């Protein structure tokens, strides 16, 4: 590792962004840089153009000669793109000879991937040899190609290769100038109007005159993090180079000093101590050069060597005294100084993976300034992002979660004490768009924070917003867009999930890492350009990229007021919290003052009898999303029912659930009860029958011995309000939870629920007799079991479209997703985001489901007489399953990671065998495909309708085909079909599936 820098060389003015300091930092810059002069004629706008291909008509080659360079990350369109090839050609023709001196090429900057050609050749007038050969840089902005001076009627640019992760390379613009264009001319052309206003010039003058209270700015120099999702920046985007720099703005463009050279490493972020003397930063020293998309490297669950993971370092402001603070084969990044002298950061040392993807999920930790006493503060089962410290001393950070809601939103803002107590929502836990708020920093002389508003998919760049939650924890009025050229609410209804940010419906912005200065001023990085901005969108660009790298994380070098040093809430401070993040097994206490607050008048006092305490179980093992096909060459995406792998439900809950138990609610609505510490838990308010009147669709967590209270069952935000030690007087000891009869473990449908149907329902509803088309037997099927398939999947796109990862967005497309006629469960696939806004009591689960009414009423016959009396305990099991959002598997572990959903068991040759047999023996009655259920019995295949219906009744079949097709089970074709299941049975004997009793003994 190097930490001695070479002397910085003067910036090259070969590109627009490198030119910005020289063009813009002049104190009295005129509205137009007269030294640049007018541009010569752009001959490309008069040419006839053609290309080797186009992605579609919206990306035709004519758009690349419009004379207008598309703004970065605008709505797609306005540029030319190839269709799925890394090379191609672009041709310009004129009817009369023209004098062409220079070509200027702009890469496809509207694409988040920065799809850029690499090597090129330029041929003039059908000459045999190219006139020019060269290589483009993978960057935004103009890149000039000088041409030999001669009359031309045709220019052909052969693009010989592209940079990695450029699936559809092309050009935002191709200009052909009659005279060489200077760098100054190109730069001036790109100066946006908001940097030429008197207010922008005054803003620059404030900085240069020192009236903002500082002269130097700390910066991180690195390549841009071009990544596939906001939660993968610890895995993707590593490209070596850069370091820590101190920039001094001056009239002539300023002085740039390197204080730490990252060498072959890369620094993501840095934070300056409150006294301005020390820097803590995250750096990865080397290893695999990973970039977008992660599908190319997803066989890597976590890098095994320390150097391939981000680690935290501390160094003095002059670059001396470097010390590494964290170690090990895990990522530690996003550090920020705490008022007590410690450091907060995120780490993925405790194994947890995104349920809908393949990467680890770092969460919030803290340590002393020297790296000692590292301990986990957050119990998130997904990812935490970009912590910083509020003026009141709490840590503010971004939290990604999806408790019974879609995965794309919501990455909202949360606050917590530096000791891990007092977790509270800050803003956005029910905001669908923007999908992500991150990089939050407190406004020093005002309320609220500045943050980046961005997407779920794509980079961590977007627009900049000021958020004041006093206007409402989810209210749009709380958000002020400080970059009005960016549509922070961009979303195409019917075309993609809210907050998703796919190419045609996302926020297009280049801003990241804002730092409020006070006086409605802030520093920010825009595409690697450091800007000084105000809240009225005036901007002054200070420093542009150099050496193919930009500048990020700007911070003024000056002492800062120290935020409040918090002592935190009541907790057991003798509890030893392991540095590796393991759960200690301790307990905490929750006190509910009045559970009816927020539920009245829809819920009457006295209705709620218990509170269920439920844990979201993390995905603790890595599962590759792409696996080898078992039926031929190549790879396949194994995600099913949304993005589930391993599969847990039919498009409902992503995570398995663990019910810790039930707490009794007093007549006045109060309750005090113990809960497990250090795990993500949420609550269900249950009526006297055990049905969930209201549910949390978020989670909280507590430290050992912590006491946390809430006013009631909030309708507007499901978060807990911390109660300071000494403010809370309990009437007695907190009650222990009543544990469920099946034990405290992952909720398994076959274990907990299926027995109810076996005892009370399958005598009538079985493979032979299916009143109403309902079979409630427990035979294992390809994904689940029969009763789960019938109750959960019937009437939904999960019957046949289980490979679909989503659906069009909005409640108006509920018909596309469908809903079970038996259970009102919550969709969580992409496109179903709006159901997070449907929060009325009894809207979901058992109170809204036909199945619950059948069980309550005894399933009356045509005379109104009950057919069955289901005991209270059995009914409660089924109600709870519905209110947990119908999980099937009680674990995210799998013995079959290579299968679809890491679960599916289906003979490879079953379909072909059935088709061949049917073509000979069933064609008289059945044209085309045989009638089949959308599920297939696996362990008892003889009970599938395609074997029962054609089998003679005398041989044990139903003979629903009329005349027997198979006179006996000895029929060769019957046996041939049956034998296709033999390999599956052998596999399951060797490696039981997670819904089999033998699973625990052999789980890998």
Tell what function each PLM region has.
Residues 34, 180-214, 239, 600, ...:
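Aromatic- and Gly/Pro-enriched helix-to-coil junctions and flexible linker segments
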Residues 37-100, 108-120, 135-137, 147-149, ...:
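Disordered, acidic Ser/Thr/Pro-rich linker "stalks" and the adjacent N-terminal cap
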Residues 158-165:
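Short beta-strand-plus-loop segments that form exposed binding edges in beta-rich domains
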Residues 212, 274-275, 338-340, 390-391, ...:
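Residue-level detector of Asp-centered blade-edge/turn motifs that repeat once per structural unit
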Residues 219-239, 282-308, 345-360, 397-411, ...:
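Short, conserved, GDST-rich strand-edge loop motifs in beta-rich repeat architectures
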Residues 243-248, 308-318, 360-370, 410-421, ...:
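Beta-propeller blade signature
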Residues 252-266, 317-331, 368-382, 417-436, ...:
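Multi-bladed beta-propeller domains
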